[in-house]
Amino acid sequence: MVLRFITSGESHGKGLIGIVEQMPAGVEIGEEDINRELQRRQKGYGRGGRMKIESDRVEIFSGIRNGYSLGTPISYLIRNQDFENWQEIMATGECKRHEEKIVNRPRPGHADLAGAMKYNQSDMRNILERASARETAARVAAGAMFKKLLESFNIRVYSQVKSIGPVQVKTWQVNEQNWQDLREKVDESPLHSVDTEKEPLMREAIDQARSKGESLGGSFEVGVIGVPPGLGSYISWESRLDSQICALLMSIPAIKAAEIGEGIANSAEPGSRVHDEIFYSEEGGLHRKSNRAGGIEGGISNGETVWARAYMKPIPTLYKPLTSVNTKLWQEEKADIERSDICAVPAAAIVGESMLAFAIARAFLEKFSGDSLDEIRKSYTTYQAYLKRVWKWEKI
């Protein structure tokens, strides 16, 4: 079996539950490691009132003892503090106040209508509660564990916002030397950006959207430093690392496009200005001077930083709602309004880190499989020696 995880829970239910399977034994994981990542997700200028209620903290139920993974399934819970206000609406038994929060005017752009048609639900709350981005808190908790696994092999994950609405911002070209600096800067920024000069413009765009009852999307970059060559494969479509990464990024609510490296810009350029040339020197071995490919060629990691961009549409809940249809009365009305963020791009970047960490961790374990961290480390050390001996690969 391969590394996998599953989540469950509703936005206003008792909490979110997750299970991580096939995590090798011996990975150092603590609740505080996970809580730090959960706190990063909750930050961001443009978040809604829910973040004033929730203070996400994980409770690990199984799979970890004395601070280390056991190799058994890791189960965990994140309680929803807001459930106190929804107990009689989201009860698993009789919902005494069920009628108060019925949703039958689907929001354009949300799962409301399509989900209700698929699952034959007249009350679309039964759809939106699970489709809500609240679920991503459970993903970030799992992602914290995948990051701890990768960090055991000096593989680091990062993210940075690329745009908020129409405001495009500068990003860093990230490497082993500046990774920590970038992490500190984006975590200090309410927009998760290194471009302090453009921060007022981003804030202004969000404030204007709020005043108009609008929402804003944007884009972010995620990357992994220290990925060895050889993860993923060209042998079959599902084994290509780039296809796995894009699928995982687009599983994040509201993400409507993803690219590996400079994929979109590269489509308009001649090949001579796109492909990353290969160089060799006695000191540096095989190396590249550019990384427009995003660290993946032929579906396989090539030893450069693996990086991607994801593009987020504006959140579907608008405080000046669009036209919809009341599916009980069958007449046009304005869509329902749910408490929501104005802009969640900074938070989505943290979720993107988790999804990318999962993709790389899964591919890493497929390549260097083992039941314990020590067993995997032996396999990886042997592979590193092979790369250096046969392929003059010095980035070890």
Curated annotation (Swiss-Prot):
This one is known as Chorismate synthase
Entry binding sites for FMN: 130-132, 298, 313-317, 339
Give, as in the UniProt entry, the pathway in which the protein acts: Metabolic intermediate biosynthesis; chorismate biosynthesis; chorismate from D-erythrose 4-phosphate and phosphoenolpyruvate: step 7/7
> Which keywords are on file for this protein?
Amino-acid biosynthesis, Aromatic amino acid biosynthesis, FAD, Flavoprotein, FMN, Lyase, NADP
Write out the function statement from the record.
This reaction introduces a second double bond into the aromatic ring system.
PANTHER family hit by this protein: CHORISMATE SYNTHASE
Q: Give the gene symbol.
A: aroC
Q: Which family does it belong to?
A: Belongs to the chorismate synthase family.
